[in-house]
């Protein structure tokens, strides 16, 4: 650890500082203001003749990004969470003894506390003229050689802390993510929803069709599953009397990783008694309008080279109409299992002949429709067979009162009128068990306690989930989900695998 020559040199400098009575890791140094506040507060000097104000004695802090030694003076750039600032100090301003120590031992990556006044250099740069410079933290590992940051994308994800040090834009993206979560939370609170927390470890892998992570509870001696979705617990709360609830938290799915999938991801799920899925569409449009406004993005944003228009109302189209309009498929084809199988095989797509009609229609949708839904589009009336927790339509028992929101060819939200008939729910769980026994690893398991909860009566309720990660990808124009997750899942390095062997 810390055994290369550059790291060893820095360790020696840290030891030398200790010998000089300077702690390279002091327990507490208090800064007075951020660099942005310093710039904003003292920008008035730009309008003055002198372009300096020596009556100021402000204290700021930041990481050294660049040092330029010019004889008896040093110019340095420091950076904090928000911005950067040039600082200047000399033998005269900090004293010859301290200047000599700093000149010898300060390096890019070190964190410093600086006291001084604002001034403008001869080249016109707003700066801080330092009277005191204190080392707050000595960096042992040098920053990457390239000042503009890491170029290896894998290294950026594995060492996010270095990525954030070197790339201010990365920090800004995660500030946007934090703001998005905060805005969503306040939006639902202002609508009268109650934020709740439900279990992360479930006795049954349910709530959505996906392969779970399995763990073991030593004390109880039983298997537990990291939650796939919080849905069934949130609906239990509606049964219990909470009429509007939401939860922002992690979900886990033991599946592949790609540009839009990470094994652990963040969602908001919300349930609203005495409302229907059309109300959820209206609510979702309102939420997006708020986010775009508060983030100053306007009604049209760019994502992956495409311009997306968020003007209300969003397009609303049924599942089958979307197959015809966007998939270019005939109505008689999408209603005929044999014709669907033939179409899929002709176009080179895998087709399982054992799948029933609704699942085959889903294959059509995935292959011919989804990528064409660029502007926000609500697709409704899904096949009931792929919607095991949704309420059946009163007009057509083969249709679920369900919708999904697609933007730029990706699903962003899924909502439906909740199934509250306990007998119907029980029968659908039985069909899921049949599918699981037939080899469908993602099929739901029976949850008799949930069915029992429905037996006590759940009021007519609509529920929805929105993927926070994909939403932030959209709002920050990022192609990979790993760009919006601070510490995404990564494949083990070869060296890590060898150590385990």
From Swiss-Prot:
It comes from Campylobacter jejuni subsp. doylei (strain ATCC BAA-1458 / RM4099 / 269.97). Belongs to the class-II aminoacyl-tRNA synthetase family. Mg(2+) 2 binds at residue 411. Pfam families: tRNA-synt_2, tRNA_anti-codon. InterPro entries: Aa-tRNA-synt_II, aa-tRNA-synth_II, aa-tRNA-synth_II/BPL/LPL, Lys-tRNA-ligase_II, Lys-tRNA-ligase_II_N, Lys-tRNA-synth_II_C, NA-bd_OB-fold, NA-bd_OB_tRNA. Mg(2+) 1 binds at residues 404, 411. Binds 3 Mg(2+) ions per subunit. Keywords: Aminoacyl-tRNA synthetase, ATP-binding, Cytoplasm, Ligase, Magnesium, Metal-binding, Nucleotide-binding, Protein biosynthesis. NCBIfam families: lysS_bact (TIGR00499), PRK00484.1 (NF001756). The keyword Transmembrane helix does not apply. Its cofactor is Mg(2+). It comes from the Bacteria. This is Lysine--tRNA ligase. It catalyses: tRNA(Lys) + L-lysine + ATP = L-lysyl-tRNA(Lys) + AMP + diphosphate. PROSITE patterns: AA_TRNA_LIGASE_II.
